[in-house]
């Protein structure tokens, strides 16, 4: 998974963060784009984030000591062979890794929750929230169409576009 997604550092934290940023639920979708929301949903989310905070705080070296191995310590300081991600664009991968480090350093559940809400507001959640471009994949044998994110896209600014001056002006105005 680390190779496919381009993760590095504490892989346990990367994995937990990956779960959090991809799980579309009532709280994450409510916070998407708008940020903090009011209501009892925060109590449920705080409860769930307290469990995740405990998982982030768990010392994996305890497992190594109990099992007499060094496997867990290897995933606590992982260096990826290739920084490129096959499944995420670099911008998304970097944001997930940054969030992973922030969550690992969070002092309490409130800070943990604030970091997650900020991420949901800034980048969204799940496949449709995290990616910029998509393609339709027609599955003839199953008889349906699937939406698949395009992961290898360049970050383009308006200044990069040649022509389209009238359209660019309308966008800016």
Across the structure, where does each feature detected by a protein language model lie?
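Intrinsically disordered, low-complexity N-terminal extensions of AAA+/P-loop NTPases
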Residues: 1-100
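Alpha-helical interaction segments
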Residues: 2, 123-124, 161
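Interdomain "pre-motor" coupling segment immediately N-terminal to P-loop NTPase/helicase cores
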Residues: 81-147
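Dynamic helix-loop-helix/coil hinge segments at AAA+ ATPase domain boundaries and subdomain interfaces
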Residues: 103, 146-169
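Conserved helix-loop functional segments at active or binding sites
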Residues: 173
